[in-house]
Amino acid sequence: MSRNVDKANSVLARYQELVAENTSGYKDYSRFKRPTAVHRISNLEEAQRWRAEVVKDIGNKVTQIHDPSLNEMQIEDINNELNRLFQEKMRWESHIRRNLRGPDYRRMKQGLNTTGGTVINGTRYFGRALELPHVQELLQQQQQQRVKQQNQKQREQELRAKVRQWEEELGPDYYGEDVPPGMQEYEAQRSRELQDILRSAAGRAPQVQIPLFERLPTQEEVEGWLVERRRKRLQERLDL
């Protein structure tokens, strides 16, 4: 009997919602399943209402993930659901901004803060999810990487400071930026003198005469000549 009463009340509630929607335009979006294909929603007001439902679900999940009675598996499930909701919210906001010419929610700072959480390797972690062992390990690695980057930046700043100090102490003379008076004239005169020497040397006969052969000897002839030369040297050494 009670099931029939509940069923009748449910039918009555749906009928009342339908009447209210037809007469005043009111629609309880929380009782409907959100569309997964956001691009199919062409009405700006309807898209904004669906986004509001996502924001409400995010608020409820953020409150739920702080519950101290949750175990690690439940915490991970809620945190994964929060990340999914954030992605859905971004899809609605992008559709509203680009396709429906609606407001840009990225620049709006009112209402529920839905940009919270700690982002680690592209994943947001909320509430007690930050206490999970593997998340603590990721946080430690992130902190070590941050310290390493800060140390690297500090070393670069120290090196720049040393370079500036060297430039101030050594001055432009060390780097050859200031040319002493008469240096350019001397270098030009010396260059002309060296060019004259090279030209005069080019006109003289070379000190080493390169023989001209009617034909080049073969490899066998060269080897025979080397053998004969070694034989003569050996005979001279032995006084033969």
From Swiss-Prot:
A GO cellular component entry from the record: post-mRNA release spliceosomal complex
Protein keywords: Cytoplasm, mRNA processing, mRNA splicing, Nucleus, Spliceosome
Record carries keyword Cytoplasm: yes
Transmembrane regions listed in the UniProt entry: none
GO molecular function: first spliceosomal transesterification activity
Location relative to the cell: Cytoplasm; Nucleus
Keyword Cytoplasm: yes
Pfam families xref list: Isy1
Chief place where the protein resides: cytoplasm
GO biological process: generation of catalytic spliceosome for second transesterification step; mRNA 3'-splice site recognition
Family of the protein in this entry: Belongs to the ISY1 family.
Subunit-structure text: Associated with the spliceosome.
Function noted in UniProt: Involved in nuclear pre-mRNA splicing.
Protein name, as recorded: Pre-mRNA-splicing factor ISY1
Organism whose genome encodes this protein: Eremothecium gossypii (strain ATCC 10895 / CBS 109.51 / FGSC 9923 / NRRL Y-1056)
Gene that this polypeptide is encoded by: ISY1
